[in-house]
A protein has these predicted regions:
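Short terminal alpha-helical segments
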Residues: 1-35
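Intrinsically disordered, low-complexity regions enriched in Ser/Pro/Gly/Gln/His and often acidic
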Residues: 1-2, 109-112, 121
């Protein structure tokens, strides 16, 4: 693992000001560390939200249903992880944008606000809702 990424997981202050860290972390190679960070009581709230966002990026980009059984297993693992950390996922909703919010709502079994445009809901389904 790259030294900066290892430090991001181990040092609560490291990388807190790094923009788009969720995109950097959205790598299947880091999935065990992402899951462990969500389980870590010492993990910061801000970074846990980044982890949820990274998981959503993985779900969107690495789990298309037409890629076969491996992709389906990965998607279910990510969804299960998000469900296990529903409290963090719900707090992340205001930070991930409307499409990913709908993805989270779908994973958590929460209703989509009725005033959300249909295109947002449709896009969320494309991204793993």
């Amino acid at each position: 693992m790259h030294e900066d990424i290892a430090k991001w997981f181990s040092d609560p202050k490291h990388g807190a000001d790094t923009q788009d860290m969720d995109l950097v972390l959205a790598d299947v190679e880091f999935l065990p560390q992402l899951k462990a960070y969500l389980d870590d009581p010492a993990g910061t709230e801000f970074k846990k939200v980044e982890v949820v966002s990274a998981l959503l990026e993985l779900l969107e980009h690495d789990c298309p249903p037409d890629r076969g059984a491996e992709s389906v297993r990965l998607a279910e693992d990510i969804r299960t992880t998000i469900r296990q950390h529903a409290d963090v996922a719900q707090r992340a909703m205001s930070d991930v944008g409307p499409v990913k919010e709908v993805v989270l709502r779908s994973i958590l079994g929460l209703p989509v606000p009725p005033d959300y445009p249909q295109w947002i809901v449709d896009r969320a389904h494309e991204e793993g809702a």
